[in-house]
Each structure stands twice: as C-alpha cells, then as structure tokens.
Amino acid sequence: MSVKNGLVQLENLTSMENLSVDEVMGLIKRASAFKAGKADFALDEQTFASNLFFENSTRTHHSFHIAERKLGLDVLEFDAQASSISKGETLYDTVLTLDALGVDICVIRSGVEHYYEELVNSDNIHCAIVNGGDGSGQHPSQCLLDLMTIYEEFGKFEGLKIAISGDLTHSRVAKSNMMMLQKLGARLYFTGPAAWYSEEFDDYGHYANLDRILPELDVHMLLRVQHERHDSGESFSKEGYHTHFGLTQERAKMLKPTAIIMHPAPVNRDVEIADSLVESPQSRIVQQMSNGVYTRMAILEAILAGKKAK
C-alpha cells in the first residue's frame, strides 16, 4: 500500500488497520474528485469484478455494483444459492475458481470474521480482495464513506467531538470508525447499553452518558440494533431502546445547530432515531449513501492502481 502522485495504491482492502492516515486522506480526496466530476479515469484493459455477498445488503452491494459500472468494469454478480457453495464448496475454493477464470477483484461480505485472511495469504489466489463486511469485525468501505461525509462537513477531523451510539459490540462499522477516527485526531465518546460495551473500546474513547455529552457533539453517529447477532434475551424492546438510548426528538434539540446526525443504515426508525429526524436538516444519512458510490470508486481505482504497479 502506498500513495504515489496523489493516488493511493492498494493490493487489497480488508481492514482499516491496514490503512495509513495518508492513504485515508488520499481516498477521501479522490472520492470527492469523483463526486465533483473532476477525476479522470480510464481502464487500460478489460477488468472483471465479482460481488460475493453471503449476508443481505442493499447499500454496500448496490453501491459497489454502481461504482464498478461507473469505472467501466465488467461485473459478475454472484448468487450463493445458485453457486457450488450450495453443494458444499468453500469460500476459498469459490474465490480460487473465480481467480482462475480471470476475475480481477472480489468484493466479499461474510458473516465469518477474518474470512479474508486465508484468501490474501494464499499463493494461488491473485485477485484483489475487498472486504464488504466480515461479521462483527470490520467494514472499511463504510468507514471511508463516513469519513468522507464528516470531512465534507468540517474539513478536518482533529478535535471534533464524535459520539458513536448503540450496538457497539456487534457493529463492524463502530470498530472500523473508532480505530481510524482516533488516529485522525477526533475525540470519541461511546454511548448505549452497558451490555453492548467492551473495555477494549477504552483504547479509542470514553463510555459516556448520552444526555450529558449531546450539547458538545459535532457528530452523532448512530448504529443499528443488530438483532440477528444477539443471543436470546440480549435485545431490548423497540420502545424501551428508543426511550433510553435513541436519538429522540427531545434529545435532538440538545444538539448544536452545526452538529450532524449519521447512521450507516439500514435504519430502524423510532428505535435508534426518531422517524422525523432521519431526513431532517441536520441528518447526513442520505448523503452517506450517495458518498458510498464515490468512496467505492476511489477504493476500486486504488486496487487497480495497486495491481498495475505490481
């Protein structure tokens, strides 16, 4: 991984741990250039991408597809139920096969954390791996689009007060963001049920009372309650969660006028956030979705640049 002549070069993108501040800023600025229509890009040769999603997805899956098409890539959509996965073939053997067929980039989402390790460490798999989310592990492309959205608003990260609120333990978005936001100089707070907080997060910020810190925040980043990753009896009722931990209309009045509201979506309206706030003037939730296409264009361009530089 490196930055040359202002362009990032990546072999793979699996975790925010693997990215430097320079690479992150390079990707954000390149995504902004794509958004502004000021980025020149042309493929040198036919390039194939395949999107392998083993967990449901709307935003990540479709924005990667659109990004790939905008860059001129040939996209092979992958249906796990119609593939040899349904016959017992492993993910490794599936990617090995796609690589042998000539696929250049595999975008993968899996419920298995760190699934990508055996793929990127294989001597026989040469296609680039882009992690579209691995269980409760990492979600680097979501983190980068979140960072782009924050940077568009404030033009900096240093000194910003940011709260990440909700289902922290089960959220790959939270883990990717806390890791990089701290590195970029933001001051982080974590709020939500104590049962969904881990002491390992103390390395990045502080567990806080939401009502006390709301007036100080520049960014309030809400997280979806991930019922599908909970043990039985671990979840709250929708009404109870919204009352005690959600961004209600009354709590939103405590935010500074310049503060922004974010959520990686899908949104559980009237659970994490009041329905009326999802598309409110302070919300950047729709902007995050739009930025996902441009961020993923920048990621794919960096992957292609990395392959070319080999």
Swiss-Prot record:
Pathway it works in: Pyrimidine metabolism; UMP biosynthesis via de novo pathway; (S)-dihydroorotate from bicarbonate: step 2/3
What does the UniProt function comment say about this protein?
Answer: Catalyzes the condensation of carbamoyl phosphate and aspartate to form carbamoyl aspartate and inorganic phosphate, the committed step in the de novo pyrimidine nucleotide biosynthesis pathway.
Q: PANTHER family, alphabetically?
A: ASPARTATE CARBAMOYLTRANSFERASE, ORNITHINE CARBAMOYLTRANSFERASE, MITOCHONDRIAL
- Which residues of the sequence carry a binding annotation for L-aspartate? 87, 172, 224
Top EC class, one word: transferase
> What's the protein name?
Aspartate carbamoyltransferase catalytic subunit
Entry's Gene Ontology cellular component terms: cytosol
The entry's carbamoyl phosphate-binding residues are 59-60, 109, 139, 142, 265-266
Print the organism lineage: Bacteria, Bacillati, Bacillota, Bacilli, Lactobacillales
State its Enzyme Commission number(s): 2.1.3.2
Stretches that traverse the bilayer: none
Q: How does it assemble?
A: Heterododecamer (2C3:3R2) of six catalytic PyrB chains organized as two trimers (C3), and six regulatory PyrI chains organized as three dimers (R2).
Gene that specifies this protein? pyrB
Biological process (GO), any one? 'de novo' UMP biosynthetic process
Q: Which UniProt keywords apply?
A: Pyrimidine biosynthesis, Transferase
